[in-house]
Amino acid sequence: MIYWIFLVLAIICEVIGTLSMKYASVSGGYTGMIVMWLMIATSYIFLAIAVKKVALGVAYALWEGIGIVIITTFSVLWFGESLSALKLGGLAMLIAGITLIKSGTKKSVVAKKTTDSVKNIAGKAKQVATVVKGVNKPISSNVKEA
């Protein structure tokens, strides 16, 4: 659970950093650039911690995808950028892609049952091998044939 919190923090820092970059380019001040550098660096640190337990593909897709959706929303609201039907379609496809990637990483019940079955069969095979090995012991040299 803690790793998901780090992923959320990484997304928040990335959004703040990217919006600060836009603010710096519009205002011409250095404050936005300093905030951008700090937030982007912090974002990568949090992302690096998150991927210790969250699948890299999922973490990166969520980090970039959710970040893009939030950044686009605030760019329209704060900076007056346009949002066309084509951009909305792209954002919808992005969200659909993130959903597919996230849902594809869950371990299914079938996979667990298959793994358990393979382990069970391997255990039985080991037992059989032990029995067969005991039956196939060589006849000792001190036993005389009749």
UniProtKB/Swiss-Prot annotation:
Subcellular location: Cell inner membrane
Single GO cellular component term: plasma membrane
Primary site of residence: membrane
Single annotated GO MF: choline transmembrane transporter activity
Bilayer disposition of the protein: Multi-pass membrane protein
Keyword Transmembrane: yes
SUPFAM superfamilies per the UniProt record, alphabetical: Multidrug resistance efflux transporter EmrE
Transmembrane segments: 1-21, 31-51, 54-74, 76-96
Pfam families noted in UniProt: Multi_Drug_Res
Keywords: Cell inner membrane, Cell membrane, Membrane, Transmembrane, Transmembrane helix, Transport
Disulphides: none
Gene Ontology terms: biological process: glycine betaine transport
Keyword Membrane recorded: yes
Subunit structure: Forms a complex with MdtI.
Biological role stated in the UniProt entry: Catalyzes the excretion of spermidine.
NCBIfam families the record matches: PRK10452.1
Similarity comment: Belongs to the drug/metabolite transporter (DMT) superfamily. Small multidrug resistance (SMR) (TC 2.A.7.1) family. MdtJ subfamily.
Designated name of the protein: Spermidine export protein MdtJ
Gene (UniProt): mdtJ
